[in-house]
Amino acid sequence: MYSATASNTFFLLSCFLLFCLLSAPSCVSMFSGIETGDLEKRDDLFPQILRDEAVARLYELGKVSDASGYLERTFLSPASMKAIDLIRKWMEDAGLRTWVDQMGNVHGRVDGANENAEALLIGSHMDTVVDAGMFDGSLGIVSAISAVKAMHVNGKLQKLKRPVEVIAFSDEEGVRFQTTFLGSGAIAGILPGTTLEISDKREVMIKDFLKENSMDITEESLLKLKYDPKSVWGYVEVHIEQGPVLEQVGFPLGVVKGIAGQTRLKVTVRGSQGHAGTVPMSMRQDPMAAAAEQIVVLESLCKHPEEYLSYDGHCSDSTVKSLSSSLVCTVGEISTWPSASNVIPGQVTYTVDIRAIDDLGREAVIYDLSKQIYQICDKRSVSCIIEHKHDAGAVICDSDLSSQLKSAAYSALKKMEGDIQDEVPTLMSGAGHDAMAISHLTKVGMLFVRCRGGISHSPQEHVLDNDVWAAGLATLSFLENLS
């Protein structure tokens, strides 16, 4: 029987759908992605290259893994070497001249109409975290190659006003050697010679690992990988947002105005190893208990920095306010020795990841945290060592590049949707990107692409096919209007 309640529900639903269709283009975009209609018939939108082929390549690259059942592709692993060959083949298919440098970065270059002009660098990273999604990093590489291929197909590639170089960076995540930006850092010239001496958990040094992969490198040759700043015009990176903002506002693309600074610490706490059943609680020097207390202090400090730092003398009111909105802290890895259920650990090691837009505020947090870590160790009669594994200052994206990317994104979305009532959003990035390293070499700009649920560093990471298309079309528009 058809009830009055069902009738009312149907009427309300019909009104809502009619409202979406008539007055809110972003509503349609929010729920179902960009409506394509007859767009596939338009040659200037290159759906076969910028969407179909690009998506197929992302899925193909997503299967190149060192693990069975999940995606793991770390710095110059066997899977990474396969990815290098695959990416290089795609670059050559797009009309690019290719090579691989001594840090495992894949380069594809076209000189355009003026080979002596400053070059645009565009790219992202090909390595992944453990149990990764397939869009992080890879989307920026594939969208750049696809845009270049579209220009190659329509005969515009050699007419570029300046050289364009697509780069797939070998290591951004820093999974194996616990130090990020090995690939882009080499290009930017920010890696000290001692970088080659860094060891992984098996005590294999970077220089020996590179040699095993036929990339014999010395401190001198590492320095030679740095690009001459006078030869580079700028750097652009397309990347999934890794957050929920674009999905919430119903926009496929957004322009990044800045990237949070980041510090990685390694904390080692040493105590007295003993039998779990025979050492009285009052006589223990337990590094696990000390580490647990330190981690709780870290959480409190990062949740409420105003309570810890306002009267410290290190922070102004504006810095504390900035920290309250941007500070995030994470303990992502803990290990114990000897790691047995019936043994009081002799040593506990954990990592700390601290990020904030305000560099002075981030440094104040590190200062306060370090002070409290040592106080807890003294109180519990254990020893502590704090190592700084990585430091990267916050980066503000170039205003001119950002403006050009915003225009390119608007142009792409207008071609696909027909009408855009709202402005392309701008947002900050809490995640680190290769653009941070390259900012030491040249001006940088970034374009974010919406991802489902804001999920990243997870197999659940997902980007709509048409959003991949929008990213490629925006990149193409940017290249076509390159000054």
UniProtKB/Swiss-Prot annotation:
Binds 2 manganese ions per subunit. Mn(2+) 2 binds at residues 136, 173, 457. Inhibited by borate, fluoride, L-Asn and L-Asp. One of its GO terms (molecular function) is allantoate deiminase activity. The gene is AAH1. Keywords: Endoplasmic reticulum, Hydrolase, Manganese, Metal-binding, Purine metabolism, Signal. This is Allantoate deiminase 1. The keyword Signal applies. It is found in: Endoplasmic reticulum.
